[in-house]
Amino acid sequence: MYKKFEELLERNHKTAYQVSKDTGIAQSILSEWKSGRIKMLGADKLKILAEYFGVSIEYFLE
């Protein structure tokens, strides 16, 4: 799932830091997701990211 997030970052020329600041999702949460300490973000955070990038929540689950 994090790979999908990385693809969106690259496609939109964003950093995780920028996304954190823009969405209010703590950078520590994104870092833990990247490292694998968090396997899946909560539905609330996935919804925020999906809206931010203009994709469906399902995009992250494919």
Residue ranges and their predicted role:
Residues 7, 21, 32, 62:
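DNA-binding alpha-helical recognition surfaces that contact promoter or target DNA
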Residues 9, 20, 50:
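The alpha-helix within a helix-turn-helix
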Residues 18, 29, 59:
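Residues in the helix-turn-helix
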Residues 44-59:
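DNA major-groove recognition helix of helix-turn-helix/homeodomain DNA-binding modules
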